[in-house]
UniProtKB/Swiss-Prot annotation:
PANTHER family: GLUCOSE-6-PHOSPHATE ISOMERASE. One of its GO terms (cellular component) is cytosol. The active site is at E284 (proton donor), H305, K420. It comes from Mycoplasmopsis synoviae (strain 53) (Mycoplasma synoviae). It is an enzyme of class 5 (isomerase). One of its GO terms (biological process) is glucose 6-phosphate metabolic process. This is Glucose-6-phosphate isomerase. The keyword Ribosomal protein does not apply. NCBIfam families: PRK14097.1 (NF010697). InterPro entries: G6P_Isomerase (IPR001672), Phosphoglucose_isomerase_CS (IPR018189), SIS_dom_sf (IPR046348), SIS_PGI_1 (IPR035476), SIS_PGI_2 (IPR035482). GO terms for molecular function: carbohydrate derivative binding; glucose-6-phosphate isomerase activity; monosaccharide binding. Its EC number is 5.3.1.9.
Length: 430
C-alpha cells in the first residue's frame, strides 16, 4: 500500500492481520469523524487546516519574518513545551538537521521545554551577544516551563532592545489567558492557536508555521503535502487507506496479540525529533483508562548497539514501526583503496545509502524471522517540505482512528494535569 509520499509494508511472521474484519468499525469511525458527529467534534479543526488555513494571518506571519530579516535577527528563541514546540522542532530538524548543508535563514533555539537551570542559563548565554527575537507559544500562558523561560528571555531582550516589543511574537488563545493579556498590554504581535485544535495536533497552525517561516522552511509546501495526504486518505476502505491500515495493524497486535510496546525506528538521525513528536501524539492520544500501547523510539543502526540485544532476545512484548528513506539528497560511493588496510574494499562501488538499506533489511529479517518481533515498515519519499507535511497528516489521521478503535478520546490528556496540580501546590501557587 502506498501514497505519493509513503509506502507501507507488513512483515508479521506467522501472523495475518484480519484487516477486513475491522471494516465495519473503521467505517463507523471514519463517517462519524467526517460528519463531525463524534462527541469530540469541537477538536477536529486540524483536519482541514491544510486547505482552509487563515491566509490573512499567514500573510502577517510573512510580514513579521520579513521585518526580522531586515533587522538582521540571527536567532529566534521558540519557547513552548509539548505540542507547542515539538512540531516546530521536528520540522526544523527534518529540513535542516544539525550538520545539514542547507542552513536556516534564522537559527531556531528551543527553550521552555524543561526546568533545568543549567540548560536555561546556557541558552541565555548563547543568545546574549546575538540579535535575537522570541516566539512564545502557549494557549493559556500558565504552563510553568515556558513561562519561566519567557520571563528570563524577555528580561534579557528588554535589556538589549529599546523597542523589544517588536521582537516578541506570542502564539496563544485568540481572546483570553495570561499570555494573551500580557501580549495585548505589551503590544506584542499575536498569532492564534485555534480553539478547535489541541496542542499535539497544532503543527499546521501558527504554532508550527511561524517558526517554519522564520527558519526559511516553505510552510505552504508543508501545507500542500498535508493537503495531498489528506486527499489520498479519503477512503473509508481499510485496504485503501494507509493510515487506517496502520491503525488497524497496531490495534490488532496490541489487543489480539498482546504486544505492549511499539518502538518507532528510523535509520536517519534527522528523524530523531520526528520520533519525539510521534511519541507525544500517540502517548497523549491513547494512554487513558489503563489502555494504550507504550510508544518508544530508536535510531538504527546506532541503537542496535544498545537496544538491539533486548529487541532480538528479550521478552516478546514489542513490535517495530520502521520509517526508512527512499531518496537521499546526498550520498557517498565507496572506491577501492590501493592497499586495503581497513578491509573495506568489498564495499567498492556501493553507495552508503545501499549499505544503510542492507542494514535495514538484515535487521528486519533478524528481528521478525528469528526474534519474532513483528515489523511494520514505511518508506518515505524524501526530506522535503511536502513530505514533512504529508507525514504529519498521516500520523494525525492514524492516531485518531487508532484511539477510537481503542475506545478512548484522542483529543484530551487528563493525566498531564495531575503533575501540574501537584507541582503548583508544592511551589505555593495560590
Amino acid at each position: 500500500m502506498s501514497s505519493s509520499y509513503l509506502k507501507l509494508d507488513f512483515k508479521l511472521k506467522n501472523q495475518v492481520v484480519p484487516f477486513e474484519s475491522y471494516q465495519k468499525q473503521v467505517s463507523q469511525i471514519h463517517n462519524a469523524v467526517k460528519s463531525k458527529s463524534v462527541e469530540e467534534k469541537d477538536w477536529l479543526g486540524w483536519l482541514n487546516l491544510a486547505s482552509d488555513y487563515n491566509k490573512e494571518e499567514y500573510a502577517k506571519m510573512e510580514e513579521k519574518v520579513a521585518q526580522w530579516l531586515k533587522d538582521k535577527v540571527e536567532v529566534v528563541v521558540v519557547i513552548g513545551i509539548g505540542g507547542s514546540y515539538l512540531g516546530a522542532k521536528t520540522g526544523y530538524e527534518f529540513i535542516f538537521g544539525k550538520y545539514s548543508i542547507k542552513k536556516p535563514q534564522m537559527e531556531l533555539v528551543f527553550a521552555g521545554n524543561d526546568i533545568s537551570a543549567e540548560t536555561l542559563v546556557a541558552k541565555l548565554n548563547y543568545v546574549k551577544d546575538k540579535k535575537f527575537a522570541i516566539n512564545v507559544i502557549s494557549k493559556s500562558g500558565t504552563t510553568l516551563e515556558p513561562s519561566i523561560a519567557f520571563r528570563e528571555f524577555r528580561n534579557l531582550l528588554e535589556q538589549k532592545e529599546v523597542n523589544s516589543w517588536e521582537y516578541i511574537v506570542a502564539t496563544t488563545d485568540k481572546q483570553k489567558g495570561v499570555l494573551f493579556e500580557l501580549a495585548t498590554a505589551k503590544k506584542y504581535t499575536k498569532f492564534v492557536i485555534p480553539d478547535d485544535v489541541g496542542g499535539r495536533f497544532s503543527v499546521l497552525t501558527a504554532v508550527g508555521l511561524f517558526p517554519f517561516l522564520c527558519a526559511g522552511i516553505d510552510a505552504k509546501k508543508v501545507l500542500e503535502g498535508a493537503r495531498q495526504m489528506n486527499k489520498e486518505l479519503f477512503s473509508e476502505n481499510v485496504m485503501e487507506n494507509a493510515a487506517y491500515k496502520y491503525a488497524v495493524a497496531r490495534h490488532y497486535l496490541h489487543k489480539e496479540k498482546k504486544y505492549a510496546v511499539e518502538i518507532f525506528v528510523s535509520y536517519e538521525p534527522k528523524l530523531r525529533y520526528f520520533a519525539e513528536w510521534w511519541k507525544q501524539l500517540f502517548a497523549e492520544s491513547e494512554g487513558k483508562d489503563g489502555k494504550g500501547l507504550w510508544p518508544s523510539s530508536a535510531i538504527f543502526s546506532t541503537d542496535l548497539h544498545s537496544l538491539g540485544q533486548m529487541i532480538q532476545d528479550g521478552p516478546k512484548i514489542l513490535f517495530e514501526t520502521v520509517l526508512t528513506l527512499e531518496n537521499p539528497a546526498y550520498d557517498i560511493t565507496f572506491k577501492d583503496n590501493v592497499i586495503d588496510y581497513d578491509k573495506l574494499n568489498y564495499l567498492s562501488d556501493k553507495k552508503l545509502s545501499e549499505v544503510n538499506n542492507v542494514a535495514f533489511n538484515a535487521t528486519m529479517e533478524a528481528h521478525s524471522d528469528e526474534g519474532n518481533v513483528p515489523n511494520i515498515s514505511m518508506l518515505f519519499k524524501d526530506f522535503s517540505e511536502e513530505t514533512l507535511g504529508a507525514l504529519f497528516m498521516f500520523f494525525m489521521r492514524a492516531v485518531t482512528m487508532s484511539a477510537y478503535l481503542l475506545g478512548v478520546n484522542p483529543f484530551n490528556q487528563p493525566g498531564v494535569e495531575v503533575y501540574k496540580k501537584n507541582m503548583f501546590f508544592l511551589l505555593g501557587k495560590k
